[in-house]
Amino acid sequence: MATASVSFKSREDHRKQLELEEARKAGLAPAEVDEDGKEINPHIPQYMSSAPWYLNADKPSLKHQRNWKSDPNYTKSWYDRGAKLFQANKYRKGACENCGAMTHDKKSCMERPRSVGAKWTNINIAPDEKVESFELDYDGKRDRWNGYDPSTYTRVIADYEAREEARKKYLKEQQLKKLEEKDGEEGDENVASEEEDEEDGLKIDEAKVDESAQMDFAKVEKRVRTTGGGSTGTVRNLRIREDTAKYLLNLDVNSAYYDPKTRSMREDPLPDADPNDKFYVGDNQNRLSGQALEFKQLNIHAWEAFDKGQDIHMQAAPSQAELLFKSFKIKKEKLKSENKDKIMEKYGNAASEEPIPRELLLGQSEKEIEYDRTGRIIKGQDVALPKSKYEEDVFINNHTTVWGSWWKDHQWGYKCCKQTIRNSYCTGLAGIEAAEASADLMKANMARKEAAEDEPVRHEEKRLATWGTDVPNDIVLDKKLLDEALKKEGARRKEEMDERKRKYNVKWNDEVTAEDMEAYRMKRIHHDDPMRDFLH
């Protein structure tokens, strides 16, 4: 209700006021009228339709919502394009030197530059243009349709109508051509009758509607028509499908999840129901139907190609990715067909070959064959066994058996010489004996190696004794050699004290004897010995 002043109302009056507003919104009561006689839309909320208290409005009105600060000088008119004003007969001072118009200068002139301007010729002086200036508001400056003439769109409509007429004419010609080809041999009467039937079948009669399906739609409620946009004269029941929202198909909490933000339900809400009776089986069906699979394959191909170094990106260049995917599929099919042809050329095609004889399939035939006691054929024709594609009974390189007549250690060979190398020369019994001898020698070597691994040689004791870490108890030292070793050790220690006395022709002896080790031990200073200071 668009009331200006707020006065106290009883509970009954307030209830009647609410009922009146609901009736106006439903279109069952006439809308409220303002002081100018215009109807007020009942759907306008009260905080917008009620005038403020300081306006002292006695009657309902919407004037307080109008722009009372509007500029009276504002106009929606636009430039008069191409309008001309006064045209002079001779050049005027300050006019354009090229055309002679006063509204612009030579730099801004839009005419073709003359060889001799109007300033010097006074010929063909151009008229002055109509220059206008408008005061536009914020929206007017940004209105892209400001100054648009709707009548110019009639040319577009005319183009579409001409195109539609040409299309209908072409379709009619094609239909007549088909009818003439189909009924060229029949009479003119039959041709005319069938042509009419064909045209009637091609046309769609929009007036034929099933009345039983429109019974609910025919229910009309009488309502009052208002100009405020609140309701229309007749309101039909548009919800006649009687469908159910997908989130109401199964009210179980543990059923398919419904996302209210995206309005999606991926899983099937009724998985146990009959598929023939279900209209909705979940949004995942759209991912496995239509062009979704092709788009998925396209994305996978783009990812794999990018990983292999191809400069391809599905989002940055989708057309390029699609063309590359098409060329990839063509090459793949071509390669597949080439491989198939090679295999069929090499092994043949059992599907296209001649059928197998019946006697081979069933194991019997109607042919009568008689044999004697030795197995020879007396009467009838001998059954020719199928030949192998390999040459049979052909001995090469002096072999007496064919390749594959001998098998040993997962290898094929010749039985005559027991060789496993194909196309080798036959060695006969000598080759067999040599192969056996080499095999026996290999076995003996392997047995000897195993025995040697069981008893390792003791070289470690000799090395330990040489370096003095472990000296046997039964060692016998020569006194002369020991004295010489002591002298040599003393000389070596003196050389360590002063290496400058060492001569250039020194001969070193790397052999270490037991006497040398004993002399070294006797001359060595033990750091833990308390009498080490009295040794020298």
Swiss-Prot record:
Pfam families: Slu7. It is found in: Nucleus. Residues 182-200 have a biased composition (Acidic residues). A zinc finger (CCHC-type) spans 94-111. GO terms for biological process: mRNA splicing, via spliceosome; RNA splicing. GO terms for cellular component: spliceosomal complex. GO terms for molecular function: pre-mRNA 3'-splice site binding; zinc ion binding. Keywords: Metal-binding, mRNA processing, mRNA splicing, Nucleus, Spliceosome, Zinc, Zinc-finger. Belongs to the SLU7 family. Participates in the second catalytic step of pre-mRNA splicing, when the free hydroxyl group of exon I attacks the 3'-splice site to generate spliced mRNA and the excised lariat intron. This is Pre-mRNA-splicing factor SLU7.
